[in-house]
């Protein structure tokens, strides 16, 4: 396993993967790669495969390119590995084969997610304003509500930028943050990255208030969310608010 020193050094490796029949879960932009290189990006090249390992606090995220007939193997690891395999329905068979290859190396399925999309809606005129919360408070709340390895919590600098840009909408009370919605803006649509309500505040409409804040912030823009399958309250909330499955699904795997 070797560390990537620059995007210029990585680009030829990536170009070699652009062939028919290659299965991948890697959809990063050059800017994304540069951030990963700065934080710690490693790679392993083998017989029909390229693995990219992205450094996180106490674990690594795994991305892969698998050619037909690849003889997949993993470099020695001292940290847990997490990977997510996302695909449309027409690509399910190929991604299932990739999952089987990873599970043969010791990965275990954690859960599945389904992407739901809601068409644009009229922006509310009377949505309340979000309360301000510090980066430290937001980070602590996310770590309380989501698994630190599989919860897609951004690296500190990325999260700090999201807080500064107003992309983390909060409700607060005397006990701190009571509800939080973290979203990623986009030209065609926004995406909800995290939506959580503190345990003692659930069942009182907090999630709906946060969604109204998002609609006001984005002008009612089309919106997508990856929601965990089998979490009934979340599934009911999104269905009630017209978020419909759009054909994309994923499985989250972990090793270690």
Model feature map: region roles:
Residues 1-29, 120-152:
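Short amphipathic alpha-helix that is part of the acyltransferase structural core
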Residues 25-80, 178-193, 198-199:
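Conserved donor-binding loop and adjoining core beta-sheet/short helix segment
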Residues 68-80, 197, 203-217, 236, ...:
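Conserved acetyl-CoA-binding loop-helix of GNAT-fold acetyltransferases
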Residues 78-126:
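Hydrophobic alpha-helical segments and helix pairs
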Residues 83-98, 224-236, 251-256:
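Conserved beta-strand-loop-alpha-helix junction that forms the acyl-donor binding cleft
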Residues 97-102, 237-239, 243:
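Conserved active-site tyrosine of GNAT-family acetyltransferases
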Residues 106-119, 224-226, 244-256:
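Conserved catalytic-core motifs of GNAT/GCN5-like acyltransferases
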Residues 125-190:
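Flexible, substrate/cofactor-facing loop regions flanked by secondary structure
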């Amino acid at each position: 396993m070797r560390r990537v020193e620059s995007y210029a050094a990585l680009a030829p490796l990536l170009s070699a993967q652009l062939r028919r029949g290659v299965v991948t879960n890697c959809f990063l932009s050059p800017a994304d790669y540069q951030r990963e290189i700065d934080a710690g990006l490693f790679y392993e090249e083998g017989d029909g495969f390229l693995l990219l390992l992205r450094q996180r606090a106490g674990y690594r995220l795994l991305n892969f390119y698998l050619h037909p007939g690849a003889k997949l193997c993993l470099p020695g690891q001292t940290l847990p590995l997490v990977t997510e395999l996302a695909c449309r329905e027409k690509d399910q068979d190929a991604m299932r084969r990739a999952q089987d290859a990873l599970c043969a190396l010791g990965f275990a399925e954690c859960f599945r997610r389904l992407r739901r999309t809601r068409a644009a809606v009229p922006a509310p005129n009377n949505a309340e304003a979000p309360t301000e919360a510090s980066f430290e408070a937001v980070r602590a709340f996310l770590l309380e509500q989501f698994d630190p390895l599989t919860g897609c919590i951004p690296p500190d600098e990325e999260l700090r930028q999201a807080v500064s840009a107003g992309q983390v909408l909060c409700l607060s009370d005397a006990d701190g943050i009571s509800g939080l919605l973290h979203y990623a803006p986009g030209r065609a649509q926004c995406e909800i990255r995290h939506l959580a309500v503190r345990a003692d505040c659930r069942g009182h409409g907090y999630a709906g208030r946060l969604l109204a804040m998002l609609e006001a912030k984005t002008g009612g823009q089309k919106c997508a969310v990856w929601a965990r399958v089998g979490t009934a309250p979340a599934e009911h909330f999104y269905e009630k608010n017209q978020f419909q499955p759009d054909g994309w699904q994923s499985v989250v795997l972990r090793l270690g």
